[in-house]
């Protein structure tokens, strides 16, 4: 019986250690094609290397959430960190600003990364 209790305790400690691992997401915002004003394109926000898996990602146009956004399935890398791709169709122009806002347990406040049309 004592052996079972020790094994159970070790398992619980191991699981709690896994939950304690936290890695902030790397955020990359880019378009599928080079930016050309007036030409349809896709805006991508790739978040990677994060743990735990709970994350909230929004694509923004002029600071407001874009509603029609699709995303890949949550996947994980060899190191057990997670990654996702969020994307939407958009038509760039000179006046509109686009960004990706990410909320994760590793951030005190959501982090926003702007799209750089020259990247």
Curated annotation (Swiss-Prot):
Q: Which CDD domains match?
A: IgC1_beta2m
Domain Ig-like C1-type: residue ranges: 25-114
Q: Which residues form a coiled coil?
A: none
Compartments in which it is found: Secreted
Return one Gene Ontology term, BP aspect: immune response
- The leader peptide range reads 1-20
What InterPro entries does the record point to? B2Microglobulin, Ig-like_dom, Ig-like_dom_sf, Ig-like_fold, Ig/MHC_CS, Ig_C1-set, MHC/Immunoglobulin
Which keywords, in A-to-Z order, does the entry hold? Answer: Disulfide bond, Immunity, Immunoglobulin domain, MHC I, Secreted, Signal
Q: Name one Pfam family in it.
A: C1-set
Any one Gene Ontology cellular component term annotated for this protein: extracellular region
Its subunit composition reads: Heterodimer of an alpha chain and a beta chain. Beta-2-microglobulin is the beta-chain of major histocompatibility complex class I molecules.
The protein's job, in short, is: Component of the class I major histocompatibility complex (MHC). Involved in the presentation of peptide antigens to the immune system.
Give the protein family.
Answer: Belongs to the beta-2-microglobulin family.
Q: Which PANTHER family match?
A: BETA-2-MICROGLOBULIN, MHC CLASS II-RELATED
Q: What is this protein called?
A: Beta-2-microglobulin
